[in-house]
């Protein structure tokens, strides 16, 4: 298990407060959203995996925002298709 230092991750993000927010969002995605990790898990908890992803530059606030926007657009398109299908069947 590779050791993660907070300082390395802070250098990628800019400050500790943003690091906490980004790591928490990413850990929540993996834990409850069914998102796969971008680094080997090695029996680590989602928070540690999130910090490793940030440290390696794989996850940033911009990446998380873009992914969430894309997922929301896909969900809205699916809902619109379902509503259209229901309307056609009436």
From Swiss-Prot:
Its EC number is 2.7.7.6. Pfam families: RNA_pol_Rpb6. InterPro entries: DNA-dir_RNA_pol_omega (IPR003716), Pol_omega/Rpo6/RPB6 (IPR006110), RPB6/omega-like_sf (IPR036161). Coiled coil: none annotated. One of its GO terms (biological process) is DNA-templated transcription. Keywords: DNA-directed RNA polymerase, Nucleotidyltransferase, Transcription, Transferase. GO terms for cellular component: DNA-directed RNA polymerase complex. The RNAP catalytic core consists of 2 alpha, 1 beta, 1 beta' and 1 omega subunit. When a sigma factor is associated with the core the holoenzyme is formed, which can initiate transcription. This is DNA-directed RNA polymerase subunit omega. The gene is rpoZ.
